[in-house]
């Protein structure tokens, strides 16, 4: 999940890497996303040497031992400091979200799971505003460690809730969601979580685990932004909404299909059963989240065209800063989902799907992913339609 997004971004040979405005990540993919948001294209110079070729698991507790079993009873075999310290020492060098914010593009949303409220937790300005905390001082390494904190392997990452010190009112979207019994369930659940943060009675500390528990594609942040929006153009600005012609979301899914031999016999090994239960929950969540996101995107496209066409032409032209002809209907949103199963070569596809999800990647698997991911994106039919749609006009 770490390498696939990286290779999809940089090996597609489409020039889109210069036009990325937002990266939303989950689990191991958050390492790639955070480093890209911090370094931009410069990450290509050293990411393979600094991370992909390293054995991160050397810094983690992975053996079965009495001491590790005791640690397991305390929440997880590894606390957050092992992975976080490795990331700071080798990759992020104590960088914070403030360092990313100063770069301005791309915006970075890292996704974890709030295991008390059973909701996604997005490391962005909106969430930290609700906690009355300062996102700009928060370490990238700690957010990444939370996003990738697989249960049992890692103890929860714990951050303090300052909600009782808030001087500002609850976010308007949260108040609206709580006051509307018909509000979307995902919006209402997150509004209730924010209410608990502010009340500070039950949640003095927010405890976070792997974002894949609640959203294994990292799409919830955008869904919440749209469902809680006050205007058709949000979370964009009016100017951005007027100037835009094309919006492309590339959803990278490094999930694997069902595998193993345990379904061939009557009996089921306990470890296989535990893994199957986890995979079932995650895969069902992935399907539902993606379908909801795709439907929301179509609806947003229609709403935004309608809003643009109702704007006074003088106001639109003032925001364009150009004399080019403007067509209010010239706006299209696209979503492209990239998966291993889209690899046409069955032999290569089988090898890709067998790559284990670990913090240690064998050299042959690195080479396989580097050769495959960009090619998968280029062959994707939805992506080809997007490129063909704009090949004579440029991408905006």
Spell out what each predicted region is.
Residues 1, 28-31, 38-40, 114-118, ...:
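Solvent-exposed loop/turn segments at secondary-structure junctions
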Residues 2-9:
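Short, small-residue-biased leader/transition segments that mark boundaries at the very start
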Residues 60-74, 85, 102-225:
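Active-site gating loop/helix substructures
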Residues 16, 40, 79-80, 100-104, ...:
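Extracellular/periplasmic catalytic domains that process cell-envelope and extracellular macromolecules
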Residues 9, 192-194, 198-226, 230-396:
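C-terminal helical/tail subdomains of lipid-metabolizing enzymes
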Residues 1, 16-19, 28, 32, ...:
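Stable alpha-helical elements in mature extracytoplasmic
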Residues 10-77, 81, 124-132, 371:
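Patatin-like phospholipase
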């Amino acid at each position: 999940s770490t390498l696939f997004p990286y290779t999809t971004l940089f090996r597609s040979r489409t020039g889109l890497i210069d036009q990325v405005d937002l990266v939303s990540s989950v689990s191991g993919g958050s390492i790639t996303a955070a480093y890209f948001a911090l370094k931009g294209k410069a990450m290509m110079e050293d990411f393979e040497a600094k991370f992909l070729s390293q054995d991160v698991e050397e810094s983690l507790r992975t053996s079965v031992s009495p001491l590790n079993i005791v640690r397991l009873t305390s929440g997880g075999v590894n606390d957050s400091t092992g992975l976080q310290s490795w990331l700071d020492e080798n990759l992020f060098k104590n960088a914070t979200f403030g360092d990313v914010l100063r770069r301005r593009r791309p915006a970075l949303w890292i996704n974890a799971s709030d295991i008390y409220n059973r909701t996604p937790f997005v490391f962005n300005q909106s969430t930290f505003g609700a906690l009355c905390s300062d996102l700009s001082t928060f370490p990238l390494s700690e957010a990444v460690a939370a996003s990738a904190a697989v249960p049992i392997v890692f103890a929860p990452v714990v951050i303090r809730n300052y909600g009782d010190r808030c001087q500002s009112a609850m976010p308007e979207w949260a108040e609206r969601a709580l006051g509307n019994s018909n509000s979307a369930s995902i919006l209402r659940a997150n509004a209730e979580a924010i209410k608990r943060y502010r009340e500070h009675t039950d949640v003095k500390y927010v405890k976070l685990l792997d974002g894949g528990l609640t959203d294994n594609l990292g799409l919830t942040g955008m869904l919440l932004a749209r469902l809680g929006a006050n205007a058709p153009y949000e979370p964009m600005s009016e100017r951005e909404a007027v100037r835009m012609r094309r919006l492309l979301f590339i959803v990278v899914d490094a999930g694997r299909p069902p595998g193993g031999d345990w379904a061939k016999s009557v009996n089921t090994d306990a470890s296989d059963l535990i893994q199957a239960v986890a995979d079932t929950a995650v895969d069902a969540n992935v399907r539902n989240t993606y379908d909801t996101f795709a439907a929301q995107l179509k609806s947003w496209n229609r709403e935004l065209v309608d809003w643009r066409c109702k704007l006074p032409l003088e106001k639109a032209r003032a925001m364009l800063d150009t004399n080019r002809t403007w067509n209010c209907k010239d706006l299209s949103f696209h979503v492209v989902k990239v998966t291993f199963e889209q690899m046409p070569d069955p032999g290569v596809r089988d090898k890709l799907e067998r790559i284990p999800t670990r913090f240690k990647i064998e050299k042959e698997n690195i080479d396989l992913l580097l050769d495959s991911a960009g090619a998968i994106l280029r062959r994707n039919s939805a992506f080809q339609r997007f490129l063909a749609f704009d090949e004579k006009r440029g991408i905006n």
